[in-house]
Every structure is written in structure tokens, then in C-alpha cells.
């Protein structure tokens, strides 16, 4: 099987930074899953004795805590600080940016519209910085059902698709007196998405490598399917199915921002033997 890799794929700056922080802070607790890749989390737990804790009330005062890349709600961060916990913040700088924008814009009286998945930890963290009621919408259709104020500030989950953000921005501009638009989709996400789109036009089959709970990985799969119907998401090489590759000659591979090189290489090696 011939293989072609996407021009841009895999670990982004924020994930690399977070993993380095975890490796340097052995025996620490991580507030929530550091990244959305179970295989890499297992490696960190095994080799560096870091453990995940979802409840801030269960974190002892004398324990070192790493804040996940997606960030955490403002009230949880303040709780840990008041508790006297030693905090190492691995929140991606690209996530901190929308947190700051939401806080400042809501203080200025703007209604916050956040384009993202309301159940995603990044979105939960970002929206907690709003000082007034904010809207979280995952599509233009959801926005069309909401009541908008005159002054609106639009931000996005960092892993969303730019064309959808532009549709939402256009809708707001047509209906609100004043609209502040902030493109908070991170550069790595945009590059990886464009590379996946370009590659999907050339290949017979696309394999997207990454965690099934990863937002940016699921976005890559959605993009790949636009031009390559036979696109599949796998967490590792063991999830590959031979039947997918029947009568296929050229396989494209891309990977989510939280997918380590060692997993990508294992997938690539197995496909090369088909």
C-alpha cells in the first residue's frame, strides 16, 4: 500500500508543551485529562507517575497540580489557589486568549457568543470567564434559535473549522448593531485542517489517527470525508481493518494535535505491510 502523509499533522505547540510539563513534574496530579489521547495519558501515568483528578475538592493542599491543556473553569482555578495547592499551568496559550477576550468583552457589556461544543472542557473553561449570560452554539442553526442583543462579541473553540466560524460571523453582522469578531481558532488547527482537505482530494482512503474524544481529530475526519468517503478514525494500529483497504492503492494519513509520533509511526508501519 502506497502511503502519503498530510503536509501538517500531529502534535501542536500546546500539546508538546503540556507533555513536557507533565514529564518534568513527576508524581503530580493533573486536573482533568491533560490531552485527549488515552494512549499518551497511559504512557505519562506509567512512566512519570502522574494521575488524573477531576474533583478539585479531592486534591490535597500539599499536592502539585497540573492544569490541563484545555484550561479549567475560573472558579475551580480560584478554589485551588485559595486552597494553597502548588499549581503548574499547562493551559495552551491559544486557549488562554479566548478566556481573556470573553472576560474583557463581557465586562464591556457585550453578549458573548461562543462557537463550540458546550460539553467540551475548553468551552466550559472559556465561558466561565463571562460576567454576564453567554450563548454557546455549535452551529449556525443553533444560533438562529437564540435571542441576540445589540452588542455581541464572537469567539470560537480553538479547534473549530474556519468556514463555519465565518458563516456565524456573517449572520451576526447582518442582525446586530455592533459585532466584535475574534478568530480564536489556533494556527495549528487551521494548518492541519487545510492539509487534510488537500490530501483527501488525492487519495483512495484516508486514515485519521487520534483520540475519539478529541475535538480537533473529529474535525479532521469530517473534513477528510468531504472529498474521500472512505475516511476512518483510529486511535492506534490495532483498530485498522483490512477490509477498508480492499482495491485501494494510495492511503493518506493525518493525525490530531494530541497524537504522539510513536502512535502515528505504528499506524504507518502497519498500513505499509498491507
Curated annotation (Swiss-Prot):
Active site positions, chain numbering: 122
InterPro entries: LytB/IspH
Catalyzed chemical reaction(s): isopentenyl diphosphate + 2 oxidized [2Fe-2S]-[ferredoxin] + H2O = (2E)-4-hydroxy-3-methylbut-2-enyl diphosphate + 2 reduced [2Fe-2S]-[ferredoxin] + 2 H(+); dimethylallyl diphosphate + 2 oxidized [2Fe-2S]-[ferredoxin] + H2O = (2E)-4-hydroxy-3-methylbut-2-enyl diphosphate + 2 reduced [2Fe-2S]-[ferredoxin] + 2 H(+)
Biological or metabolic pathway of the protein: Isoprenoid biosynthesis; dimethylallyl diphosphate biosynthesis; dimethylallyl diphosphate from (2E)-4-hydroxy-3-methylbutenyl diphosphate: step 1/1; Isoprenoid biosynthesis; isopentenyl diphosphate biosynthesis via DXP pathway; isopentenyl diphosphate from 1-deoxy-D-xylulose 5-phosphate: step 6/6
UniProt feature coiled coil, ranges: none
Keyword Oxidoreductase among record annotations: yes
Record: residues binding dimethylallyl diphosphate: 36, 70, 120, 214-216, 258
Annotated protein name in UniProt: 4-hydroxy-3-methylbut-2-enyl diphosphate reductase
Top class in the EC scheme: oxidoreductase
Binding site for (2E)-4-hydroxy-3-methylbut-2-enyl diphosphate: 36, 70, 120, 158, 214-216, 258
Cofactor(s), names only, from the UniProt record: [4Fe-4S] cluster
Binding annotation for [4Fe-4S] cluster: 12, 92, 186
Residue positions binding isopentenyl diphosphate: 36, 70, 120, 214-216, 258
Species of provenance: Helicobacter pylori (strain Shi470)
Functional description taken from the UniProt entry: Catalyzes the conversion of 1-hydroxy-2-methyl-2-(E)-butenyl 4-diphosphate (HMBPP) into a mixture of isopentenyl diphosphate (IPP) and dimethylallyl diphosphate (DMAPP). Acts in the terminal step of the DOXP/MEP pathway for isoprenoid precursor biosynthesis.
UniProt superkingdom: Bacteria
Amino acid at each position: 500500500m502506497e502511503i502519503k502523509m498530510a503536509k501538517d499533522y500531529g502534535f501542536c505547540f500546546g500539546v508538546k508543551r503540556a507533555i513536557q510539563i507533565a514529564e518534568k513534574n513527576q508524581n503530580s496530579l493533573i486536573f482533568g485529562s491533560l490531552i485527549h489521547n488515552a494512549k499518551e495519558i497511559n504512557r505519562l501515568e506509567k512512566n512519570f507517575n502522574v494521575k488524573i483528578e477531576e474533583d478539585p475538592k479531592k486534591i490535597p493542599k500539599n499536592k502539585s497540580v497540573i492544569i490541563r491543556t484545555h484550561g479549567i473553569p475560573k472558579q475551580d482555578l480560584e478554589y485551588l489557589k485559595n486552597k494553597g495547592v502548588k499549581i503548574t499551568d499547562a493551559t495552551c496559550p491559544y486557549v488562554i486568549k479566548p478566556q481573556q477576550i470573553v472576560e474583557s468583552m463581557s465586562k464591556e457589556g457585550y453578549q458573548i457568543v461562543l462557537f463550540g461544543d458546550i460539553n467540551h472542557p475548553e468551552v466550559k473553561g472559556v465561558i466561565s470567564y463571562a460576567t454576564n449570560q453567554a450563548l454557546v452554539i455549535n452551529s449556525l442553526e443553533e444560533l438562529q434559535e437564540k435571542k441576540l442583543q445589540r452588542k455581541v462579541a464572537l469567539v470560537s473553540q480553538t479547534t473549530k473549522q474556519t468556514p463555519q466560524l465565518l458563516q456565524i460571523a456573517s449572520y451576526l453582522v447582518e442582525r446586530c448593531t455592533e459585532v466584535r469578531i475574534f478568530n480564536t481558532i489556533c494556527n495549528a488547527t487551521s494548518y492541519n485542517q487545510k492539509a487534510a482537505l488537500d490530501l483527501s482530494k488525492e487519495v483512495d482512503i484516508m486514515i485519521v489517527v487520534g483520540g475519539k474524544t478529541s475535538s480537533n481529530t473529529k474535525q479532521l475526519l469530517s473534513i477528510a470525508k468531504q472529498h474521500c468517503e472512505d475516511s476512518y478514525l483510529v486511535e492506534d494500529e490495532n483498530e485498522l481493518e483490512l477490509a477498508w483497504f480492499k482495491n485501494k492503492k494510495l492511503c493518506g494519513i493525518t493525525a490530531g494535535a494530541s497524537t504522539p509520533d510513536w502512535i502515528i509511526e505504528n499506524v504507518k508501519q502497519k498500513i505499509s505491510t498491507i
